[in-house]
Amino acid sequence: MGKIDFRLEKTFGYTTGACAAAGAFSALYFLKNNEKLRFVEILNLKGDSLIIPIKNIEKQKNTAISTVEKFSGEDIDITNGMDIKIEVTLEKLDNNSSKSSSVKIIGGDGVGIVTKSGLQVNPGEYAINPKPREMIENNLKSLLENDECVTAKISVPNGDEIAKKTLNPKLGIIGGISILGTTGIVRPMSNDAYKESLAPQIDVALAYNFENLIFVPGNIGTKHAKILLNAKEDQIIEVSNFWDYMLDKAKEKGVKDITVFGHAGKIVKLAGGIFDTHSRVADARNEILCAYTSLITQDVEMLQKILQSNTTEDIVEILTEKGILTEVFEKVSKRVVERLSLRWEKINFSCIIIDMKGNILGKSD
């Protein structure tokens, strides 16, 4: 991508990892040059140049604290606008010191601590992923002399509250947010950071040796999978709208058996080959259900009602009145399995479709 100037850029954003790298760089620069930078130019791991504004910076003796405001561009998320503070302490090594020129990166208040196996970070450590850690380290090393070492402490004011609105509690990351971002760049409409937060669920499930994983769109599926399937928390994988991405990850990680489970409004789309189920991408629920209903009945008036329905629940009511609800949704659930099996052929799939109350509408076996 070359260079992105985030003082001007409004479409792209920068990750929590890029915030930490920029803040750490500005703090160390202040310590070494006694100059407060209003912005810094750092490099990501691909060699792209990122120009990131610095919100505030202050110094006490050999420590400087820099604040960077998270900016998500057009992909507004829960972390947009939050402050990330980086406290950098610089030490000069003498000839007798046992330390070597190095960068130490630690977490502080508002940065989560990992408690479960299977993630990129070991249990007991702060949730600072390897790629952003490497980006922070590389940019700090560019300022260090051979006889210097530095400690960078990352903290996020109110990070513990913000984290409650993320997947961190489910992943076993407690007390704060994660420092994420492979490239440091948040691309519009890509949801890269959000996808990156979803994928570790698979690692946790595999670390607990679950053979069958239950893929659900979100909270409704999670709630009823625990009740109907007696599923364990770490066995349930919340996919959101990103079925293609998450199933690619499952295949990549060697998952053999997946149960697709959730509300008809999302799962029906999979039968039509729609693997990003966000309504802005595609919404063919009515058309798909109309097509499968037409295999059972030629009642044109009813088919028209299905096409004109406002919600999937309305269609469920129409099919119930006609007495063909189960027959239609069993066909749909079987088609979901066929669609997924064609693309992710090494995974054994089953499918269960429910309504808002958790009633089973149809299943593939």
From Swiss-Prot:
The keyword Methyltransferase applies. Its EC number is 2.1.1.195. InterPro entries: CbiD, CbiD_sf. Pfam families: CbiD. One of its GO terms (molecular function) is cobalt-precorrin-5B C1-methyltransferase activity. GO terms for biological process: anaerobic cobalamin biosynthetic process; methylation. Keywords: Cobalamin biosynthesis, Methyltransferase, S-adenosyl-L-methionine, Transferase. The keyword Methyltransferase applies. Disulfide bonds: none annotated. It catalyses: Co-precorrin-5B + S-adenosyl-L-methionine = Co-precorrin-6A + S-adenosyl-L-homocysteine. Pathway: Cofactor biosynthesis; adenosylcobalamin biosynthesis; cob(II)yrinate a,c-diamide from sirohydrochlorin (anaerobic route): step 6/10. Gene3D superfamilies: CbiD-like. Belongs to the CbiD family. NCBIfam families: cbiD (TIGR00312). PANTHER family: COBALT-PRECORRIN-5B C(1)-METHYLTRANSFERASE (PTHR35863:SF1). This is Cobalt-precorrin-5B C(1)-methyltransferase.
